[in-house]
Every structure is written in C-alpha cells, then in structure tokens.
Amino acid sequence: MSDDDDFMHDSADEEYDFEYEDADDDETGDIGIENKYYNAKQIKVDNPEEAIDEFLGVPALEQDKGDWGFKGLKQAIKLEFKLGRYSDAVEHYRELLTYVKSAVTRNYSEKSINNMLDYIEKGSDDEKAYQCMEEFYSLTLNSFQNTNNERLWLKTNIKLARLWLERREYGQLSKKVRELHRACQREDGSDDPSKGTYLLELYALEIQMYAETKNNKRLKALYQRALRVRSAVPHPKIMGIIRECGGKMHMSEENWEEAQSDFFESFRNYDEAGSMQRIQVLKYLVLTTMLMKSDINPFHSQETKPYKTDPRISAMTDLVDAFQRDDIHAYEEVLSKNPDVLADPFIAENIDEVSRNMRTKAILKLIAPYTRFTLSFISKHIKISVTEAQDILSFLILDKKLNAKIDQESGTVVVESASDVERLRSVEEWNESLRTLWQVTLKDGDGFKNDDVSQPTGIGMRGPLLYQSGLDDDTAGLLRSSGHRFRRGGKGSKAGGGLGMKTGLF
C-alpha cells in the first residue's frame, strides 16, 4: 500500500475521532497529541528516521490507550519495515495488537490490521522481509485466536498460505489449506455458502500449487469445482488466477480452443482488477491463437484492441502477424530480435509447436514446384538444420501430406509421380473441355481473340496456355506429380525456363 493510500485510510479513520469533552485540559492534551502526529507525517518522506521517533512518541502522550497511539504505532511500523528495521517493526506490531481488544473499535481494528498486512505483503521482496511477514501473520493469529473474529482469522490465514505458495513450501501450504477448508464447511462436511468468497481464494491457491507441481489430475478436479461455486461474488483477480491456471491445464492437454477461452476470460478479469498480469495472459492468448492455426486476429475484440499498440505486447503482435501471413523469415526474425518473449517458461515451452507448424508450412510451399530436391536445399532456404528438415519431411510423408521418398545416403528427396493416374486422366479431360470452351466462346465467337496465334498452347494440347486459365492448386499439384512441366514459350525462352515444374534442385 502506498503512502497516499495510507493517508486516505487515516482520513477515513479520523471520522471516529471527533469527541466532545467538557474539560479544557483534555482538549489541550488531545490537540498536542494530534499536532505531534501530523508533524511526524509531514517529515516522514524527507526524514523517516526522525518521523519514526515522533510517531512512537504519540502513544506516550496518552493517559490511556486510544486512537492516536494506535495510529502513531501504525505509521512507525510501516516506516520501520520500509527501512528494513524488521525486528523493530515486529516489536511495535506486537504492541499495536494490544490496542485491538479495547482501545479501538472492532471494525476499525480489523480494517487497520488487514491494511497493515497488505502493506507488508506488497513490500516483501527478500528472505528477511518474508520472515518478518511470517512473524506478523503468526502474531496476528495468536492475538485473535481467542476472539470471535473469524473473518480476520480467515483472511490472515489465507495471506499466510499465499506466502508459503510464493516460497514454494508446498507441505506447509497443503496443511494450511486443509485447515481452512474445514473452517469453510458446515457440520455435515458440505461447503458453507456464506464463505464462498474465501472458498474461491482457497481453490485459487490450490490450483496454483498443482499447476506449479504439474499435478494435472488434481488441478482439473479443483478447477471444475471452483467454476461450480455460485455463492460468492469473487474478486476479479481471483477469477483471473483460476482461469489462467485452467488455460495452462488445457494447453498441456493440447486443447487449444478451451485454452484460448480461459485465457481470454483470465485477461478480462485481470484487466478489470487492474492487475499487471493481464499483459502476460494476453501473450498466452496470442500464443493459443497461433496454436489453433486461426486466421482471426486476437486484437480485434473490444477488450484486447486497446493493447494492440502496447510496446509490452508488440513482439507478440508482430509474431502473430507473421504467422498469419505464413512468413517464416519474419516470424524467425521477431523471435531472434525479442529474446524476452522466451523469458516466460510457459511461452518457451509451447512456442516450439508454433515454430514447427510454421516451418512445416514453409517447407510445403518451398518444395511445391519440384519433383526432386535435397535436404540441404531446404536447410538453406528455411534456415533450419538438415536433421530437422528430414524430421519434418518424414512427418509429412507418414501423415500422407507428401508422397515422396527420402534417400538418406545422398540426402535427396524424390516426389512420387504415379500415385493418382485416374485422377490425372480426369484432369486432362477437364482441360480438354476448357479448350473446347475457349474455342467456342473466344476463338469462334465474338469475344476477345488471341492475336499471337503462334504462341505455344501449353502441356502438349491445342488451346490457351493453361497456366493463365486459373488452375487450382490441386490441379497444378497433380500435373506436377505426373512429370508435366509448364513452359513459357516465345522469343527468348531458354530450355527449362518459365513457369512450372522443376525436376531437380541440388
């Protein structure tokens, strides 16, 4: 929590402080305490050490424990923690907890303790700070153990469980989660609907633990139970966590569509909560779009459109653009120029599948005109190793997407040419029909006429050049497999030049 936030809380707290006393001495004393408190606040930024002494002097001015002493201790503890004076912070926090039973109201004390623990949690960034935070939680739980404040007990325990998750102390976390689950149940063992919000927070903690430990079986069961909770109005950040882990679970199962749906919901919830994790999850959303081989731009939705030009996401924007254009070289260039994309272990783990899809499509596009080529030819043009080129070609052959044979000794690939004779004959009949149609409508009719009657008509038949007649890819592929070659005739043509089939490339 920032200092500004703290000022706001203090301002709100001070609504409780207006008391009207008849004794002038008491009024003078209160004014002196109040002045000391606000003087300390004025110097806390420029001179925090002196401010701590001033804040700690406030409780001593009160005859009985009261609001001003409570506030002074709060401010001193936060400054001590910020300056790394952890033992002093723990000592004064122990003193602060003596105020909560009688000196201040229950609601005010609960709110203040919660805010204090949030401040400590957000400011912890090293092992000593974590140890201090754990002591704060322990002192809080001991202080409220014999009180009837179950709400604060639950909140503090959940914070402690979150600390153990961050420190990967899964044994401690599992015990604490089981204890909290029992606290959120009725006597018959069923979930208590009145504690649905706490229950979702527990599910979120467990789901994160099982996601980190790769226990997908338990993760899936908890994920489904969490989505069935209807008795709570959860914080959007909690739902963002649950959906993010659900998306990762679906990714591990290669269920790209469900993963995309969960990542989108996670992004939407993080965005609503103002969490910076929305940027990372948006990257995951882009990743699933590529894994789905979708042509839909993930930045076209109303929720994601504002982030399309965000510099933190620009690398992923360029990546999906290159992917959807089937531009393997642009795709590889984006990855090489933005190594931070692979800094996320989850993206690094799954981007290989996208890269392989890109290289597979690039190879199919590259070899389309040829009946014979070498592995080194592919390696050179796609910029991959010969081993990977052979691996991808083997996959295409086994998947019946390429009818070819690999000669490993010579490193040569020969595309088979006689696999579909019947279909080729049908294609030739279709070509004959096109020739007849051309004669009727253009040559013998009133339509456009070909002035260059001496121009070759292509593929050994009379009629127009078929490479200009709009042959589809399948037809062209069949003609390649039969060994036919298109040639541009006319002046200046060299043998083997022009559009069409190349029988060998080494």
Curated annotation (Swiss-Prot):
Subcellular localization(s) per the UniProt record: Cytoplasm; Nucleus
Pfam families listed in its UniProt record: PCI
Nucleus recorded as keyword: yes
Comp. bias (Gly residues): 492-506
Location of region: Disordered: 482-506
Domain PCI: 252-420
Main location: cytoplasm
Leader peptide range in chain numbering: none
Sequence ranges of Basic residues compositional bias: 482-491
One of the GO BP terms on file: protein deneddylation
InterPro entries: 26S_Proteasome/COP9_Components, PCI_dom, WH_DNA-bd_sf
SUPFAM superfamilies per the UniProt record, alphabetical: Winged helix' DNA-binding domain (SSF46785)
UniProt keyword annotations, A-Z: Cytoplasm, Nucleus, Signalosome
GO cellular component: COP9 signalosome; cytoplasm
The keyword Nucleus appears for this protein: yes
Subunit structure, interactors included: Component of the COP9 signalosome (CSN) complex.
Family: Belongs to the CSN2 family.
Function: Component of the COP9 signalosome (CSN) complex that acts as an regulator of the ubiquitin (Ubl) conjugation pathway by mediating the deneddylation of the cullin subunit of SCF-type E3 ubiquitin-protein ligase complexes. The CSN complex seems to link protein degradation to sexual development. Required for fruit body formation.
Stated name of the protein: COP9 signalosome complex subunit 2
Organism: Emericella nidulans (strain FGSC A4 / ATCC 38163 / CBS 112.46 / NRRL 194 / M139)
Name of encoding gene: csnB
